[in-house]
Amino acid sequence: MAIKVGVLGAQGRVGQAIVAGVTAAYDLELVAEVDRGDSLDVLVQSGAEVIVDFTTPDSVMDNLEFCISHGIHCVVGTTGFTPERLEIVKKWAEEKGNTGVLIAPNFAISAVLTMAFARQAARFFDSAEVVECHHPNKLDAPSGTAIHTAEGIAQARREAGMPTQPDATEQSLDGARGADVGGVKVHAVRMTGMVAHEEVIFGGPGQSLTIRQDSYDRTSFVPGVLVGVRNVAQHLGLTVGLEHYLDI
């Protein structure tokens, strides 16, 4: 039996790609398209079992509270999740008990693999920095993907007992060295013509390693979202990161 899916943010660029992907999938049924100003009640009325949320940081928490309270599983690509917000969502899901929530900083499988490869490489190099590039309409900087990547690198370095990265900088213009995420510098570029791109640069004596990921179109997120939709009901509570569904 097909999984009944509702898409929130259905008129956005990513939302339109998700709608097309769900519609084309033989084992999924699109039952609701929700956008700004629409009532969430349509999700209940249409019998949606899973929702996909690509809305805005301002609306996503209200959306999740509604869906979790009604036992609708959630696959979320919206950005802006702080540790405090994640803790709130985790509490909602635990209290409900029968609902799965997947929040992922990036649903492009190439991006998920980039984050995994970066964690693996981190302990072998003295230095590591992250550069992310996005279209100029993106609301947050640095991206959730870049933050998640840097956090993974920082954790791997701590687990390996590595010292602070070498950096003799004493004077610089404000922001010149990027944002600091657990001791890993993250740089954000906003530029016309870009979609979503990330470079992770590692450096050691006499060598460097660059891991690069490019999403040229919003359709790059669709395969990962569909993995989430098909599996979220088997992962009750809150899961952060698509990698947990991909066994990597």
UniProtKB/Swiss-Prot annotation:
Alphabetical list of Pfam families matching this protein: DapB_C, DapB_N
Binding residues annotated for NAD(+), in chain numbering: G9, A10, Q11, G12, R13, V14, G77, T78, T79, A104, P105, N106, F107
Task of the protein: Catalyzes the conversion of 4-hydroxy-tetrahydrodipicolinate (HTPA) to tetrahydrodipicolinate.
Binding of (S)-2,3,4,5-tetrahydrodipicolinate, residues: H135, G144, T145
SUPFAM superfamilies: Glyceraldehyde-3-phosphate dehydrogenase-like, C-terminal domain (SSF55347), NAD(P)-binding Rossmann-fold domains (SSF51735)
Catalytic center residues: H134 (proton donor/acceptor), K138 (proton donor)
Domain of life: Bacteria
Enzyme Commission number: 1.17.1.8
GO cellular component: cytosol
Protein name, entry field: 4-hydroxy-tetrahydrodipicolinate reductase
Pathway in which this enzyme or protein is active: Amino-acid biosynthesis; L-lysine biosynthesis via DAP pathway; (S)-tetrahydrodipicolinate from L-aspartate: step 4/4
Alphabetical keyword list: Amino-acid biosynthesis, Cytoplasm, Diaminopimelate biosynthesis, Lysine biosynthesis, NAD, NADP, Oxidoreductase
Family: Belongs to the DapB family.
Localization, UniProt: Cytoplasm
